[in-house]
Amino acid sequence: MLERLRNLVLETLPEEGRIENPMPCLALTRFNGPQKNRQCFHHPMMALVLGGEKESLIGGRPVVYGAGEAVVVALDLPGAYQIRNASPEHPFLSLSIRLDRAIITELLTEAPELRPAPNGRDAQESVSVERLPDDILNALVRYLEAMHSPRRAAVLGPMILKEIHYLLLEGPQGRVLADVCSEAAPGSRILTAVRWLREHFDEPLDIATISERTAMAPSTFHRQFRAVTSLSPVQYQKRLRLHEAQRLMLVESLGVEAAARRVGYESCSQFSREYKRLFGDAPARDIREKTVGASDAGKCACVMEA
């Protein structure tokens, strides 16, 4: 089934590039050469490598996964990755499914046995690498095959997508996926904090306010947040600001100072230092290099990875 998936991606992407939403929540990626220090922001997703190997830093956790292995991410997390060995003859290939919390919540209502036990345990780390079982691979094959038939895509697509979510909930990472979508569970409280940070990243960080919103003491909130994301709240906010600033410069053509102030920096020099520390180059030079001669896949990947 892995070979069938690989062939389906090659048929859809005969050249280097990235396709978003050929089916709902689906993205396909092909790189024909190495990629270094690509910064991205991960939505909740399952990403399966079909050719090559990917080295990623997701949140604060390093992960390496190759052909036949998948990474499952339960929360919105900043990240970076590189691909060492890829060529036109042996391209890096991957597919990803963006996880839909509405589907997960619906499944937890229909199958309450998948809900986490309300025992007050700590939140779980939100990233895992695993080999997908045959039933998920089979569902992915059927989902990609449905791309080629508008009728099947419309009728069978939603059912197969829901099936993929259900099978993931049954798997090793299902407990964490259920945790972040179950009201009052520790993971759900951290999800509340992540959403607040994403909506208010340009404001001064107020741990007391976030702790109150998550119904946790500040010390408990810090511990749980780091357990789930492998980052402190301050580190998470900084990554949000820098990724959004890069997007503003790359997509909306804002200047360095305007982007820095838009995301909450009062000091442009501090912004430039922290930007270079994360992205490896000064803001203006980094954006210039990304907009001149970059592939479509590279341009997309430096902003968002779903």
Q: Language-model segments: what does each one mean?
A:
Residues M1-P22, L26-T29, Q35-K36, G120-E125, ...:
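A short, N-terminal "cap"/entry segment at the start of jelly-roll beta-barrel domains
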Residues E55, P204, S253-L254:
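Residue at a beta-strand N-cap/secondary-structure junction
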Residues P118, A154, P172-V176, R189, ...:
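Short, structured loop/turn "capping" segments at alpha-beta junctions
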Residues L5, I104-E163, L167, D179, ...:
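Amphipathic alpha-helical segments enriched in hydrophobic/aromatic residues interleaved with Lys/Arg
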